Amino acid sequence: WSLLLRENYPSWLYPITKGATTIWAHWAGIMENGDFWTRDMNSYNHYAYGAVADWVYGNAAGIRPLDGYPAYEKISVSPLPDKRLGWLSCSYRSRHGLIRSDWKLQGDQWRYEIETPVDAVITIAGQKHEVAPGTWIFFSAVE
């Protein structure tokens, strides 16, 4: 979470503080002092660091296929909320239908809303729930 949410170099938000609207080839494409990292090789539309999206879907939202069930035939949803973000909404359109993992901070608890088109194992605050297709709402204490 810290690398994702930090605004100083190196981080994913650092380029945004310098005006980026795409993913740069180098985290310091434009350095703190405003100079270019190098004038010879600076791509400002380079997906190499875009793998953070995989981390957001697979960890922050917790959406993953269950081992032994390719193509999201059965899924695991184990979200990892963080107070610094406060809320997250991710969805993935699988061949079986929409998978959605939302969480948000509500007072002193987390509210999770999980939608699954297939059987799923949903893990919230260490507790596993085996569920059928549908939309499920869970709550857990903020730690």
Residue positions per predicted region:
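Non-catalytic C-terminal accessory modules of carbohydrate-active enzymes
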Residues: 1-143
